[in-house]
């Protein structure tokens, strides 16, 4: 097997154990777009003994915020975050999907009150995690979402 070599970062965030194929969505959550000045390394479908395959994202000069952590936890509940300072891991932790999220997901039910323009209601969902995926249930209409990727706002 060939070895994957990606250089260390001096300061920033490494997101490891991302569900395979989700790295581009992680970049979207982090609001990293083409033309960014940040140094970004991304590896997709990397062999993993625990997951079979995984994705990895490294971002030099950016430290992840709680709002971003919650969104990443929804699409990849087993992700690991490494905060790097002076090329060393300062802090390492696993993401944990919250039990309730507000203003993070959009309800797929067009008739839901959380989608009504005339009603200033923030979408609210109850989160359930099973194995390597999370599902959500709308507080207002009860609609269950299984593929959260499409509904992250």
From Swiss-Prot:
Protein function: Involved in allosteric regulation of aspartate carbamoyltransferase.
HAMAP family: Asp_carb_tr_reg
The organism of origin for this protein: Archaeoglobus fulgidus (strain ATCC 49558 / DSM 4304 / JCM 9628 / NBRC 100126 / VC-16)
Name under which the protein is recorded: Aspartate carbamoyltransferase regulatory chain
Organism ancestry: Archaea, Methanobacteriati, Methanobacteriota, Archaeoglobi, Archaeoglobales
Keywords: Metal-binding, Pyrimidine biosynthesis, Zinc
GO MF annotations, alphabetized: metal ion binding
Family as reported in the entry's similarity comment: Belongs to the PyrI family.
Entry binding sites for Zn(2+): 107, 112, 138, 141
GO biological process: 'de novo' pyrimidine nucleobase biosynthetic process; pyrimidine nucleotide biosynthetic process
Subunit architecture: Contains catalytic and regulatory chains.
Names of the cofactor(s): Zn(2+)
One GO cellular component term: aspartate carbamoyltransferase complex
UniProt remark on cofactor binding: Binds 1 zinc ion per subunit.
SUPFAM superfamilies membership: Aspartate carbamoyltransferase, Regulatory-chain, C-terminal domain, Aspartate carbamoyltransferase, Regulatory-chain, N-terminal domain
């Amino acid at each position: 097997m060939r070895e994957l070599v990606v250089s260390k970062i001096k300061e920033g965030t490494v997101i490891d154990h991302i569900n395979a194929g989700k790295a581009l969505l992680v970049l979207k959550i982090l609001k990293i777009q083409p033309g960014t000045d940040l140094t970004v390394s991304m590896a997709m479908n990397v062999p993993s003994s625990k997951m079979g395959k995984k994705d990895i994202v490294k971002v030099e000069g950016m430290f992840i915020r709680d709002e971003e952590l919650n969104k990443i936890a929804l699409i990849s509940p087993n992700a690991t975050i490494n905060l790097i300072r002076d090329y060393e891991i300062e802090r390492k932790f696993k993401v944990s999907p919250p039990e309730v999220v507000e203003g993070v997901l959009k309800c797929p039910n067009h008739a839901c009150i959380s989608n009504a323009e005339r009603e200033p209601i923030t979408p609210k969902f109850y989160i359930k995690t099973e194995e390597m995926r999370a599902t959500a249930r709308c507080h207002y209409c009860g609609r269950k979402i299984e593929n959260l990727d499409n509904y992250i706002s």
